[in-house]
Amino acid sequence: MVCPNSPRHRSPRQPHEAVSMTAIRRNTLPVRNPRTGEVDYHITPPTAEDVAATAKALRAAQTDWAAAPIEHRVAVMRKWADEIEKNRAAISKAEAADTGRYRIAKESPEAVVWGIRGWADKAPEIVKTAMLEGTSSIMPHIKFRTQLKPYPLLGVISPWNFPMMLSTIDATPALLAGCAAIIKPSEVTPRFVEPLMETIRKVPDLAKVLTYVVGDGATGQALIDNVDIVCFTGSVPTGRKVAEACARRFIPVFLELGGKDPVIVTETADLERATDAVLRGTVYATGQICFSIERVYVHEKIHDAFVDKLVEKAEQIELNYPDMHKGHIGPFIFAKQAAIVDEQLDDAVRRGAKIRTGGKSQNLGGGLYMRPTVLTDVNHEMKVMQDETFGPVIPVMKYNTKDEAVKLANDTIFGLSGAVIAGSEEEAYELGAQIDAGGISLQDTTLTGAILRDAEKTSFNLSGMGGSRMGPASILRFYRKKALMTNTLKPQDMREIRELPAA
């Protein structure tokens, strides 16, 4: 699946993983280093036949995996978490090369381990609670029991912004539910797969039901053609293609797509709190987060003071160039994204927006970097207020009344997340309840990850479909639900069921 300097990486114990290694004779795909812009890695995509063979092997192993008690799957997943912990240095190094950032890459294995162990703690009780047994409320002589049957094979297509974490966020609960999983990460950031696969191989029971295939869109299509359920995280245009491909096969699909998340800052908000929350919510990870804040609505009475303080703080944010171990934010991971953000800035300035600090991306050592960029005098005719940005841009717009603020916040085709910062929690809740989005942070921004295992949320509008990847639904969505019914009385005699006489 992966072809860096050495031509082969297969394990003889992993036939379903190794099939694509024969592809060394075919063309490889170049992978660019986001810090230098140079190609320093290559991947060899599997053929459609390779993916089909991989899927067949996973399916064969999934039957025993699903039949085992959930406690067995929990134990296996805990072993995997232990192996990731042991190999975290190599994984972090690979993801740092993928993304051009050090701190987040260093924390990535820890976040995945936290997720695996956390879901391992929760899964047995979630599944037990979902197993219902009782008597019909319509016909009391009918008893019933429910049964949960996992989808045999999950296909995951994950994005480039958080390569390792977003490749496992759906697969972890699915594996605990009893599915097998095949994951296709983005071809933009594939380096982490090699050290992560080493950890999977060290847990033999897991290696039978989990693997990665690395390739482009053709690999993704082959994956969809061979699985029973799909989880996709990425852009709306690609998500639409994935949904159409799944619809043709009548298989369920879960889409977590883009956002244009708003924050409302009220007249009563504390400016220190508000500017700290907005700055982190907009520029963390260079703004390359699906639930990053991308629209800021500030009451007109505090607008100028808010902007002044925000600009002051934004100018203290440093790039991690030339030393990746210093600074606050890294380069654009994907060069095409930098061009999209630059085009939005050009459009905004043409339409009258003012850049208070920052500006367009700049080439530093071959990497594309952008300083936190604060815009004022923006309006909803501008692309920067309508289209997903995915960069460290902070457009600030005035509002007069709370009703106007809510109307502006909801003037979007998206509905992923949002935030409200106010003088009190009650005031923030009042406004947050009116925002049409799945996860609303109050008195801060981007809090969604904190409740990953605790509360459910769905994505509104074009930000997604298929249900919640959070809370109990994160596991239960991977089950098909059966009902087994027993009649405790004698079956009705068909000979006694006659047509009614005419009225």
PLM features per residue range, with description:
Residues 50, 218-222, 404:
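Short acidic active-site motifs
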Residues 39-46, 61-67, 155-156, 263-265, ...:
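Short, well-ordered beta-strand elements within core beta-sheets of diverse protein domains
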Residues 62, 66, 81-88, 92, ...:
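Structural signal for hydrophobic packing residues in well-ordered secondary-structure cores
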Residues 40, 229, 237-379, 403, ...:
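ALDH superfamily catalytic-core signature
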Residues 37, 73, 95, 178, ...:
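Residue-level signal for inorganic ion chemistry
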Residues 2-142, 316:
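N-terminal Rossmann-like NAD(P)+-binding subdomain of aldehyde/semialdehyde dehydrogenases
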Residues 36-42, 350, 362, 369-503:
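Conserved C-terminal structural/oligomerization subdomain of aldehyde/semialdehyde dehydrogenase
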Residues 132-273, 399:
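Rossmann-like NAD(P) dinucleotide-binding subdomain of oxidoreductase/dehydrogenase enzymes
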